[in-house]
Amino acid sequence: MRQNDFENTSMLKLVMSLAIPSMIAQLVNILYSIVDRMFVGQIEEVGNVCLAAVGICGPIVTLLSSFGTLVGIGGSIWLSMCLGQKNEKRASQILYNSFVMLVVLSICLTLGFILLKHNLIYWFGGSDALYPYANTYLTIYTLGTFFALMSIGLNYFITGQGYATIAMLSVCIGAITNIMFDFILIRTLKIGVAGAAIGTVVAQFISCMFVLCFLRFKSKIKLHKEELSIEKMKHIVKLGFSPFLIIASDSIILIVMNMMLQKYGGDMGDIYISAITVAQSYFLLITGPLLGISSGTQPIFAYHFGSQNLKKIKEAFKIVISFAFLFCLVMFIISMCYSNVFVAMFTNDAMTMPIADRAIKIFCLGILMMSIQYVLVDGITGLSNVKLSLFLSLNRKLMYLGCTCLLPAFLGVSNIFYAQPTADIYASIVTIICFIKIIPSYLKSHGVK
């Protein structure tokens, strides 16, 4: 297995060696939800209802998983800084404290969501027609929360040590397992949404075991018992809170969107939720790899911030932004030309298909600007400026939430989709201005030259 050399590898090669495996890992990771929805949407007679039910569960499931990101990104950024400072002892302590945090969080979240799931489904846009399917899916998935948080959270520590290909492999193993079980349980054994949830949990279990074994026996910084520290745990949360907020608030906004679609959609409420589920699935094909680029290259910024190398930080930003923009440009062209092909993979319902196709095209209007915003916010987090990255994250989410609530009320339910590009373009402009005005002096004040 090859570990990346942050100090001596050329920046372009280093960025590509971290970004591409991380992109692929994120892309494969979203197949967990997308493949579930594809198989579920094709179930005979009840496919469209099942698709909407899984769509209701999607943001709730992502909200659960975001706690893995909280610990994973926060801990791995700090670990990378410690490696840049040649402090392997502290890096080992960070890894163990993060592991304990994930164990405790998984237990608390499992109990909490099991107790509240009935209310959550109805609060977040469910109807009587959707409830049986949503309840089945959410119950099974929640019971596997431990495996989900471990596989998601600890995988960041593999990337943070430079083993990007291994991190990608762990996700690929889980995704391939999920696809196999979905085919067997849904298509062959015909057990519906339960099969989709079971397949996901089994896949996360296998991925979890792979990650634990690698960190225990193979990585440079190995997982073993260290002293627990509340102060270290607080700092992990501090570093991980901004990316956690991005993912968690995305889930909350999608939940609110489902609620607005039911409220203003009338008899078409479930159909709108099916359509938005398809559109959101497509958008994940953009935001997932984009997050892979921005979060996968965070260790570069963290390492060179730790070693106080301004030249390397500047070079990294230029290359990462260029790569992210190029990716989003390609996806923008595909979105405008071939979105109908993607919609047909999920449903053949005549009422759902045109709504979903239109939603995809509208969602993607702001992705070119969004590419810059993602890289800058995650890069700022990598530079340990948590307050600024948190502000920029909240700024975008508040705009998105406001548009989601106001657009259907004043312009009709079909225009709720414009909330996405409006928030993306607005937030990107604010982020660019703040980055130019604040970051140079911030780096100088921390001795980065």
PLM segments and residue spans:
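Transmembrane helical elements of multi-pass membrane transporters/channels
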Residues: 17-36, 140, 174, 203-207, ...
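Helix-terminus/linker motif at the lipid-water interface of multi-pass membrane proteins
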Residues: 27, 31-51, 121-128, 184-191, ...
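N-terminal transmembrane alpha-helices
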Residues: 6-38, 42-46, 59-74, 78, ...
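Hydrophobic/aromatic residues in alpha-helical transmembrane segments
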Residues: 20, 36, 75, 116-117, ...
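Short runs within selected transmembrane alpha-helices of multi-pass transporters and secretion channels
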Residues: 141-159, 167-175, 196-211, 290-294, ...
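Residue-level signal for transmembrane alpha-helical positions in Major Facilitator Superfamily
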Residues: 16, 31-32, 71, 112-116, ...
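Small-residue-rich hydrophobic transmembrane alpha-helices
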Residues: 51-111, 148-167, 258, 273-339, ...
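Short alpha-helical transmembrane segments in multi-pass integral membrane proteins
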Residues: 1-19, 79-146, 188-241, 301-366, ...
